[in-house]
Every structure is written in structure tokens, then in C-alpha cells.
Amino acid sequence: MNKVILYCRPGFEKECAAEITDKAGRRDIYGFVRVKDNSGYVIFECYQHEDADRLVRELPFRDLIFARQMMVCGELLRDLPPEDRITPIVGMLTGVVERAGELRVEVPDTNECKELMKFCRKFTVPLRTALRNDKILQAQEKPNRPVVHVLFIAPGCCYVGYSYSNNHSPFYMGIPRLKFPSDAPSRSTLKLEEAFHVFIPADEWDERLGSGMYAVDLGACPGGWTYQLVKRSMMVHAVDNGMMAQSLMDTGQVIHHQADGFRFEPPRNNIYWLVCDMVEKPAKVTSRMADWLVNGWCREAIFNLKLPMKKRYEEVALNLEKLTQRLQEGGINAEIHAKQLYHDREEVTVHVRRIWSAIPGRRDER
């Protein structure tokens, strides 16, 4: 198997392809991409056979911005016989994967492929049994073992491969299944909830998303992102010239500042979270987020960058580079990750966590 498949948002195949080509090249792994517009996936075919496995081991999945999932795969299996679709799939995995911990029969995130979902659910049961009988799959699901993926792109046509459980998306199809809360002011609330799932390990939620923390939401109205913070019993400074949802104001946890989010400065020293979903040029948002982090006005930040029509990967990479440079110049050690989330559209979500500062005495360290 010399190919790597990356699932992505339909319409962002070129960005996903540019990113994997760039980041594979930095590891001296070379190949070519196969891209079909609006297909929801990209194939990176390595020149060296063993490089596909090496790439999915060595390239941290969380460093990929536009990929929802990453797996090694072989050639496309075409025209699987309806009377026996299982044998060719088992044959492709034999000698390649042993004692995998999970099976996922998936489809790309397109309207055409979603019509295959019902078939995938039914097909999973007999395929799982066959893989267990051949010792390709363990008798019980094991979260620390490789995952077998079967990706159907059309009836009777699928890619078969595997991913590593310590370097992939834990979600089926790479998509967290979140339910829209009926009392939330806007659907944008799901962006921040998904960001928490993607960027913050579940066993750290109590520590980093805890009750009683102070947060600032820039460009808050009507309160979709503020809702997530309030739900976690935080005290929130909501900054926006517009009106906040009355249901949030009634909680007593929200202070509404009718001000420009780009000029607002925190009124207190113990702000932990900064969140921002303002419609503005990426460079302007990045610069202001850097101000907050360098000045020690917050510990962690989650913000969205709205993407231009062209050279979207290049634009994101440039802004992340500028942010990294600003933090380094300010003596800040930080973790920076970006991801185009399922609930994002023409945008990506960035998470920054300050680890420590080389310069003592900042506001958040007193």
C-alpha cells in the first residue's frame, strides 16, 4: 500500500492536497496527489512504497489543517461482486494488518456518497465477522490498536486501508457527532463545542474548561460561543456592539460590553479563555490575537480565520507563521494548532495555549 487518503470538506481538496504535499516534502517524502473537485477526499501517492506507512506514523495528524482523517490505502477495488464483496477486501488486508482494534466502513462527506450510508451500516457486521475469523481484527474493540478503514466512493467501489489509533481522528468519518442545543442563540455554538473536542483532551476538560473561570468573547452577538462558556459555568465578558440573547444575560454569568472587539482590553487580570469569531481579514484577527497572548491577557485562545477565495492554504500558513513569530519575539512558548472543523465553512479554527513566558511578571502570572 503506497497511498495516503485524506478525508476533507468537499470543495477544499486543493487546499488539502497543497498541505499534504508541503508537509510530506518537509519529511523528505515525495509523491503526487490525485484530486477530484468536491469529492471530499485527496489521495497522495508516494513514490517509495514504504513511505505511505511512514507518513501516517511520522506526520502528526493534529498538525494537518484541512484533513479530517488520514489513512494508508491500496489500489481502488472496483466492481465488487454483489454476491461476495467481502473476499477482495479481506484479501487486500491479509498480510498488511494484523489484530486491528476497530473497523470503520465509511463514505466521503458528499450528498451522493451519503446515499451509501445505509449499506455501509449493514455491510459492517458481516465484514467485521470475516476480518475477525482471519485474525485481521481482534475479537473485541481495542482503542490502542490500528483501525481498518473501508471507504466506499461509489456502489461496489472502495479503498481499503488502515490508520494508527495514536495519530488519526477518533471520530467516524472524521466528524464529531454533536447535537445542536435548542436553547443556544445560534448554530455557531457548534463550532466552539467541536473545537473543544478536537483541541482539548477529554481528561483535561475539568482543568482547562472548569467552572468559575473567566473568559472573553470578542464579536460575541448573539451569543453562540458565549453559550458554550456559560454552559461550563464560566463568567464571560461578551464584547460586541450588537445585542446579546436575553437568555444568556439572565444567567448572571455574562457582562456585555458594547465595544469594538479589536480595541477592547480585559478589565481584570485573571482571564483564562479568549474566543473570537469575527468576520474580518485573517491578518487583522491574527495580529489582535497575538496582542492578547503576548500581553498575557489570556492563557488559551480559540479563534476563527475567514479564508479568501484563492490560495487558502497559503493564507492560513502565512498567518500561523506570523503568529508563531510574534509569540517567539515576545518570549512566549505556546502550542498552536489549526483545523478546518466540520462545522466551519470558508474558515479555519485556531487554538493557542500559552505554556510559559520567558519574561516574568505578566498579568496572567502574578
From Swiss-Prot:
InterPro entries, alphabetized: RlmM_FDX, RlmM_THUMP-like, RNA_MeTrfase_FtsJ_dom, rRNA_MeTrfase_M, SAM-dependent_MTases_sf
Subcellular location: Cytoplasm
Protein EC: 2.1.1.186
Entry binding sites for S-adenosyl-L-methionine: S188, C221, P222, G223, G224, D240, D260, D277
Active site positions, chain numbering: K306
Protein family: Belongs to the class I-like SAM-binding methyltransferase superfamily. RNA methyltransferase RlmE family. RlmM subfamily.
Protein name, entry field: Ribosomal RNA large subunit methyltransferase M
Organism: Musicola paradisiaca (strain Ech703)
Gene that encodes it: rlmM
